[in-house]
């Protein structure tokens, strides 16, 4: 063996022994981000100063005070019938009392028994509590078929989101920080102590998250700058120069690399506080013939524009949406000792979200749910902290956790999901592009079928003491182990306020040893213990009244019947909409003003979507109302009158949920539908599965929400002098893009009525639909009867209204025979009922002229609507033919219409007014809002006129008819005695 070989052996031996020595040394274990030592929590920040947040600032009064028992001020005895007015009167009465030193006015006590509520109960003043006499003693049944939340704790939203303010100057404000610097000194006397900290969502941050694009090369669902801004609602606790101290921690770092942050001040005038609902059972009635019925109450309790409020010791049954929903404008809310049972709804998106928050500093503790969907859920950009403590979900249909975009500072503490998952992760395109759903959040002593804990860029998520299958690259510690303290939330609270919090915590004990090597004595004791029934959280919650007694005692308190109940004021009606002298009038006034269509596809729930949204009578967003959501129809009417709108033209939506906005034709793999929902006329059957993943439609039954909302608007229209233009059908579903037909209720795959259309669908070129001829074909007896029944529903729904104009359908370019059929059904219905609704003929010119040439059909027509044709500026007619199986815009692509002008609009309207003097004529064609004066001077109806027009001219025009002028620029209305002259050059009116 030569020297070189010897050296090689020696080096090899040295390396081996050195490696063994290194392996023999115990590796240094990284310090956990959080651990308990001698009963004290120890936090280890990262290199930027971020640490696990202190979640204990959640709940009523930031959990620093227990929920108080408030004195009863009025009693509502049980009586048969609708109790809405009596209970609401009691709530309003207490709301009118002066508040005490602690901000409370008093409690309304419901006695033992069942109260039927057909309307909605609203707590709108601070310091008001609604109290039952016990979960097993007092029940409110949300009766009827409406979807209103049963109870709302609701103030006014007077806080406007601002994009500017004082700039935070720190380069980096870490997670859990409670102070920062701003770019100028603040004198608190010059401002409110209430601030919003706005953290912008910048392009570079979105790109780093990978949230700009979720696949397919399509970025429509990707995040856009400004769409995921966070708004931390805080109170200033102290100011030192330009250093601001706040009352609760930040849960997402404020980093100048990603836009930093700014603050702005607000006044808290609109938000209410110190309100609660307690000690009661809330039940929704429902149609027992349909196990997935949705024409009943969706939410039991909504909390909106409120702080320091609560819901406690309540059992909920049969609600379709949420037991308790805390909206984004609420903070410091406690929901405790609540049980949600037997929800009734479809299985899918926006349903069965038993305990939901999009607010801040919300505490759900000791809450239990069965057969829900997202039972414990945190929503869109909830700024945190928010906490779920000692909660349990049994056999849900989907996961609990963060369900939308970037909720931060979420704690799941002693939470068990039996049969589904707990998830912190990236949802990608789900939930309309939710992407990263959560940041800087903790699972603590949780169990589930699976726990997902993923780490988003720029943030972290942590899981301690998890029992489950595991997934994710977040921080994991002590998996498959139960750790101390049992509850992180209450350990944090105890350390923060430095006092015993056991009375608030009420954590179920785990009293026995779990060693794998017990002594014989311990084994015997545990064997004996195992034979006993295990204590269940549901039972523990049911015993809450023994641990935290809510008083139902009262002395010298009157009942609401003794105090007095205000009588309902019957609304007054405007003069009836009718045709007088061939024009539409209400009383002695012409009906004039703008018309608005509805938004029948697209949309979302983000601020930009809401800002761009149009009115829609039958749009539905569970638990939320307002522009772009479930429209508040009173607000819509007020806005219409303020903006010179006289009518809404309504047609049903192109499809129900926003997933189909992608224009795919595919069958959805689940019912994870996205709001806002454009409700359709027909009811779901509760049977089988339609193309959108919910149950199939029953075309013989009608969606009560849809028709009730239309009826409500029609009633308001009759009270306020407005008009509903009701399009019976919507042709867009059966022509053009194949996706238009995919979820259509009439499609054979989507209903239980055997409509007989080809299935699979024969899409042209595998993407276009040409089903108009089949849809309008009346040779199929099943379809013919369904059409007849549906048309009668369109009429019957408004039988007691006068301000509704019925049209055959939006975009109708169909054949003559279907219009005849439509009119036959109307004539038959009119004969049966003695009612005479206003019927407008709104079709192509050839079909219009053919109908009007037939006296029997012309007699049914009240209004001629010029919509799908017009005279072009050169005098020729743009007049596509009916029944050619082309949509209006397809005709336009072929025929390339030219614009009309004042003269030609006048010509068209006058032509039909002269030929059919007893019928009103509307012009809804090319650029109709610009030619309202032409319509007026031609004797037409519902013109869009300048708001500056003299009312005396309109009143005088009522009895006049168009006459020919010798001056080409003058248009004349006359009654033979006096005249109104309009000069198209000067654009001025003159009376002679």
Regions found by a protein language model. Give the residues of each.
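Extracellular "leader-to-stem" segments immediately downstream of a signal peptide or signal-anchor
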Residues: 2, 7, 14, 23-290, ...
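Glycine-rich beta-solenoid repeat tracts in large extracellular/virion proteins
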Residues: 120-124, 137-155, 181, 265-270, ...
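Right-handed parallel beta-helix
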Residues: 127, 136, 193, 201-233, 237-238, 273-365, 376, ...
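Active-site mouth of glycoside hydrolases
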Residues: 585-851, 858-861
